Swiss-Prot record:
Biased composition (Acidic residues): 169-195
GO biological process: ascospore wall assembly
Gene that this sequence comes from: OSW7
Note: Present with 3170 molecules/cell in log phase SD medium.
GO cellular component annotations of the record: endoplasmic reticulum
Protein's name in the database: Outer spore wall protein 7
Statement: the UniProt record of this protein carries the keyword Phosphoprotein: yes
Modified positions (Phosphotyrosine) in chain numbering: 354
General function of this protein: Involved in spore wall assembly.
Region (Disordered): 167-195
Leader sequence segment: 1-23
Source organism: Saccharomyces cerevisiae (strain ATCC 204508 / S288c) (Baker's yeast)
Entry's family note: Belongs to the OSW/SHE family.
Length: 510
C-alpha cells in the first residue's frame, strides 16, 4: 500500500505540472484571473472553460472576443488540438483506471474479511465430517461390491460355457470383436475340430484360474468369519462345503502352530531381553568405574611425585646460623633451604596416607559393585514379572478365542459332516484333546517363567573380571610404594651413619 500511495502521489504531481505547462504553452496563465468573474456566474471552472467551452461560436467565446478583441482567438483555436492536451487526456484516463482498481481492491478485501472466517469454519467442519462420510460410503458400496464380486470372472450361458467378462470395457469389447472378425476371415478353411479343441483349452484354463482363486477366497472368508463374502467359484454346493471344511482344518492347525511357537519362544525371549538390558547397564557402569580408576591413578601419581621429592631431600646438609642461633638444612647441593628436616616419621606418614586412600577406594568400589549386582537382580526380576504379565494376557486371549473357534467348528461340522460318522467323532475328540493339551502347556510354561532362574552370568563375570583388574592395579601401586620405602630406608641408614661419623669426629677434636 505504501508503494501505491507513492505512485499515486507522483502521478498527481505530474498531472498538475502538465496542467501548468499547458497553460504556459498557450499563454493562458494570465487569463485565469480574468476568467474568475465568468466562473462566478456559471457552473464551470477555469480549467473546464478552456477544455470544453472555448470553441468557435459559443457564448463564452463571443463574450471573450468582445472583451479581449481578437487577441485570444488564436489561443482558443490552438488549445483544444494541443499535444499537451492529448497528454493530459492520457493522464486523466490512467488516473481513472488506478482509482477504479483501488476501489475494486477495497471491495475484495472487505468481502474476504467477512467471508474468510465463515469459509474457515466450513473447512474445519468438513474435515471432521470426512470419516463419517467415508463410513457412509463404505456402508453403501459394500453390499453392491459383495453381490457383484463374482461377476468379474465373466458371465456364463445355459450350457456352462464362458461368454465374456462382464466388466470388460467398450474398447476391449471392440478389440475382441475385431479380433474375432479377423480370425473368421483367416480361419475359414480350418477344420471345426481345431476350433473345438481351442475352446476346450480356454475353458480348462479358465476353470483352473477360477478354482485356485475360489479356494483362497473361501479360506480367507472362513477364517475371518465372514461367510457372506465367500466367492462361489464352483458349480456345485458339495465343493463349497468341501472348501469350508478344509478351511476349518487349516484354521485349527494355524491356531496350534501360533500358540505352540509362542510357548517355545517365551523363555528365550525373556533371557534375550534380560541380556540386552544387562549389556546396556554394564556399558554405562564401565564408563563410570573407568573414570574413577583414572582419578585414582592421578592421585597416586601426585603422591609419588611428592614422595620422590621428600626422598631426594633425605641426603641434606646442615649449617649453623649464628644470627638466628639455629641449624638450617639445605638440599644435597647446599643451595636450596628445606622447609623441614626429613625424618622417617614424615615418610611413614606419606606412605600411611596412600594406603588409607587406596583402602577407601577399594571399599567404595566393591560396595558399588555389590549395589550394582543387587540392582541388576531387581531389574531382571521386574523384567520377568512384566513378561509373565504379558504372557498371561496373551494366554487368556488366545485360549478364550480359540475355544470359541473350536465351538464354532463343532457347530459348522454338524452341517458339513455326518455327526454319527466314527471318523468325524474321533477327529473331533482328538482336536479337543490337542486343545486341552496345548492349554496345559500354556499354563505350565507360565509357571516355568515364574520359577525360571534368571541368568546373571554376564553381570557376575563382569564384576569378577573388574575386581581382578583392580587387584592387579592395586598390587602394582603397592609394589611402587614399597620400592620407594626401601629406597628411603637405605638413604636414612646412610644419613645416620654419616651423622655418627661426624659426631665422633667432633668429639675427637674436643
Amino acid at each position: 500500500m505504501k508503494a501505491v500511495f507513492k505512485v499515486t502521489t507522483a502521478l498527481l504531481a505530474c498531472v498538475f505540472i502538465a496542467r501548468y505547462l499547458v497553460c504556459q504553452q498557450n499563454g493562458l496563465g494570465s487569463f485565469a484571473t480574468d476568467l474568475q468573474p465568468i466562473c462566478r456566474h456559471t457552473e464551470f471552472s477555469v480549467g473546464s472553460l478552456f477544455d470544453s467551452k472555448l470553441v468557435e461560436g459559443s457564448a463564452v467565446s463571443d463574450y471573450l472576443v468582445g472583451k479581449y478583441s481578437q487577441s485570444i482567438k488564436p489561443l482558443i483555436e490552438r488549445y483544444p488540438n494541443s499535444s499537451l492536451k492529448r497528454i493530459m487526456g492520457y493522464f486523466y484516463r490512467f488516473w481513472y483506471n488506478i482509482f477504479s482498481f483501488l476501489r475494486l481492491n477495497e471491495l475484495c478485501c472487505s468481502l474476504h474479511s467477512k467471508l474468510g472466517p465463515l469459509l474457515n469454519h466450513l473447512r474445519i467442519a468438513w474435515y471432521y465430517l470426512k470419516p463419517y462420510t467415508d463410513n457412509v460410503k463404505n456402508v453403501l458400496e459394500n453390499p453392491f461390491n459383495s453381490s457383484t464380486d463374482w461377476m468379474k470372472y465373466g458371465s456364463f450361458s445355459a450350457d456352462g460355457t464362458l461368454t465374456k467378462p462382464i466388466f470388460e470395457t467398450d474398447s476391449e469389447t471392440e478389440d475382441y470383436e475385431d479380433d474375432e472378425n479377423e480370425n473368421e476371415d483367416e480361419d475359414e478353411d480350418e477344420d471345426e475340430d481345431d476350433v473345438g479343441i481351442e475352446d476346450e483349452n480356454k475353458e480348462y484354463e479358465f476353470d483352473g484360474v477360477q478354482d485356485g482363486h475360489g479356494n483362497s477366497q473361501l479360506v480367507t472368508a472362513a477364517i475371518l468369519q465372514d461367510l457372506s463374502k465367500i466367492i462361489i467359484g464352483s458349480n456345485s454346493h458339495a465343493e463349497l462345503e468341501t472348501y469350508e471344511a478344509e478351511s476349518l482344518k487349516m484354521e485349527y492347525e494355524a491356531w496350534i502352530k501360533a500358540i505352540d511357537s509362542k510357548i517355545h519362544s517365551a523363555m528365550a525371549l525373556l533371557d534375550s531381553e534380560i541380556q540386552s538390558v544387562f549389556e546396556a547397564e554394564v556399558q554405562n557402569k564401565s564408563i563410570e568405574i573407568t573414570r574413577n580408576l583414572d582419578d585414582l591413578n592421578t592421585t597416586v601419581n601426585e603422591q609419588l611425585v611428592f614422595l620422590d621429592s621428600k626422598i631426594k631431600d633425605i641426603n641434606c646438609t646442615s649449617k649453623f646460623d649464628p644470627v638466628q642461633n639455629k641449624i638450617k638444612y639445605f638440599d644435597e647441593s647446599g643451595q636450596v633451604e628445606l622447609e623441614a628436616y626429613i625424618t622417617k616419621s614424615s615418610i611413614t606418614s606419606i606412605l600411611k596416607n596412600y594406603k588409607i586412600h587406596l583402602l577407601d577406594f577399594e571399599k567404595s568400589l566393591f560396595h558399588s559393585l555389590d549395589s550394582f549386582l543387587t540392582e541388576m537382580a531387581k531389574l531382571a526380576e521386574s523384567i520377568r514379572l512384566e513378561n509373565v504379565e504379558v504372557y498371561e494376557e496373551w494366554g487368556d486371549v488366545m485360549i478364550s478365542q480359540w475355544s470359541q473357534r473350536m465351538a464354532y467348528m463343532d457347530v459348522r461340522g454338524l452341517h458339513l459332516e455326518d455327526q454319527y460318522d466314527p471318523a468325524y467323532i474321533e477327529e473331533n475328540h482328538s482336536n479337543w484333546l490337542r486343545f486341552m493339551e496345548l492349554k496345559k502347556k500354556v499354563i505350565s510354561e507360565r509357571n516355568r517363567l515364574v520359577k525360571h532362574d534368571l541368568d546373571m552370568t554376564l553381570i557376575l563375570e563382569w564384576i569378577t573380571k573388574l575386581k581382578a583388574d583392580f587387584q592387579n592395579t592395586k598390587n602394582n601401586i603397592q609394589d611402587t610404594f614399597l620400592q620407594r620405602m626401601n629406597t628411603a630406608d637405605t638413604l636414612f641408614k646412610n644419613r645416620e651413619l654419616k651423622e655418627q661419623l661426624e659426631e665422633e669426629f667432633v668429639r675427637q677434636e674436643h
